[in-house]
Amino acid sequence: MARIAGIDLPRDKRIAIALTYIFGIGRPTADKILAETGINPDTRTRDLTDEEVARLREYIDKNVEVEGDLRREISLNIKRLMEIGCYRGLRHRRGLPVRGQRTKTNARTRKGPARTVAGKKKK
């Protein structure tokens, strides 16, 4: 089983799909990585040679931000927005949608379960 960036890639999937199991690598990035390293995207993970796995590992370590480093960078960006007090930071702090979605109705994922307001009855 190939282990890249601390993730065990599934053996029976094509390498183009298996790379997407790494946080920070989607389909377009996986295709770009395989083109740069010269590996056929249709190859199954179990059929990769040790040399190909080493090439993949080296390329990803040098050129792509993945897993823990990427998660840390994202959380630091959100923390920075909250510290400077910009609108997006305030929305993060209050747990509301950040990208302009409506909140009069919907937005339940961000706001949590509905809290009933006393004195509001439908007639």
Curated annotation (Swiss-Prot):
Q: Which GO molecular-function terms appear in the entry?
A: rRNA binding; structural constituent of ribosome; tRNA binding
Matches recorded under SUPFAM superfamilies: S13-like H2TH domain
**Known InterPro entries for this protein?**
Rbsml_uS13_C, Ribosomal_uS13, Ribosomal_uS13-like_H2TH, Ribosomal_uS13_bac-type, Ribosomal_uS13_CS
Question: What is the annotated signal peptide range for this record?
Answer: none
Entry superkingdom:
Bacteria
Give the UniProt keywords, A-Z. Answer: Ribonucleoprotein, Ribosomal protein, RNA-binding, rRNA-binding, tRNA-binding
Q: Where is this region: Disordered?
A: 95-123
Q: Known Pfam families for this protein?
A: Ribosomal_S13
Q: Name one GO biological process term.
A: translation
Entry GO terms, CC: cytosol; small ribosomal subunit
Q: Which family does it belong to?
A: Belongs to the universal ribosomal protein uS13 family.
Subunit text: Part of the 30S ribosomal subunit. Forms a loose heterodimer with protein S19. Forms two bridges to the 50S subunit in the 70S ribosome.
Q: Any idea what job this protein has? A: Located at the top of the head of the 30S subunit, it contacts several helices of the 16S rRNA. In the 70S ribosome it contacts the 23S rRNA (bridge B1a) and protein L5 of the 50S subunit (bridge B1b), connecting the 2 subunits; these bridges are implicated in subunit movement. Contacts the tRNAs in the A and P-sites.
Q: What is the name of the protein in this document?
A: Small ribosomal subunit protein uS13
Q: Which organism is it from?
A: Heliobacterium modesticaldum (strain ATCC 51547 / Ice1)
Q: What is the lineage of its organism?
A: Bacteria, Bacillati, Bacillota, Clostridia, Eubacteriales
What gene codes for this chain?
rpsM
